[in-house]
């Protein structure tokens, strides 16, 4: 290949790369789901949220199926302005009271909806949300609607096993041209 042909080919590659970079500059939020049977979903989500806080972003956290015990993530992030809303009933398999679990979930969900509507929040972490949908504590349609109506720039992180496919369908993907 001649130097001239090589230079022309590389120029075309550069134009494609530049176009992709320009497209990626669109400031829009995404939905990230950490799901599956293994460990580390909440840890990965908090790592992402911590990084966002480190870059000056405003983050809100809603924890479903968590207890009242102190945790390191909250101890670290609350002093940096991260709002936490925690269901604080403990694990639902311990309480075994569907009515009170559903009521507690609905109460915390109201805070989650407020955060999802708040354009000042760059990121909202919905820890263990998948269980709330799977256990029918929250209507799937209401969750999908709140996710769809969130501010354009807001990123949402969802954790938990068995994420419903209708939530997974909201994930933004961009196939390569």
Language-model features and meaning:
Residues 80, 169-170:
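Short, structured coil segments at secondary-structure junctions
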Residues 160-164:
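Short, polar loop motifs at secondary-structure junctions
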């Amino acid at each position: 290949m001649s130097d001239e042909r090589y230079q022309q080919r590389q120029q075309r590659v550069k134009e494609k790369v530049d176009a992709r970079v320009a497209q990626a500059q669109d400031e829009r939020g995404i939905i990230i789901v950490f799901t599956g049977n293994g460990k580390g979903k909440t840890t990965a989500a908090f790592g992402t949220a911590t990084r966002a806080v480190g870059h000056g972003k405003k983050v809100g956290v809603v924890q479903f199926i968590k207890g009242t015990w102190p945790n390191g993530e909250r101890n670290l992030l609350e002093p940096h302005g991260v709002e936490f809303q925690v269901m604080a009933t403990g694990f639902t398999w311990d309480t075994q009271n569907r009515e009170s679990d559903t009521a507690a979930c609905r109460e915390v969900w109201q805070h989650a909806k407020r955060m999802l509507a708040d354009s000042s929040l760059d990121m909202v972490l919905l820890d263990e949300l998948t269980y709330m949908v799977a256990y029918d504590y929250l209507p799937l349609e209401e969750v999908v609607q709140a996710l769809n109506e969130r501010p354009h720039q807001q990123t949402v992180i969802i954790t938990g096993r068995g994420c419903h496919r209708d939530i997974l369908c909201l994930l933004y993907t961009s196939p390569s041209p």
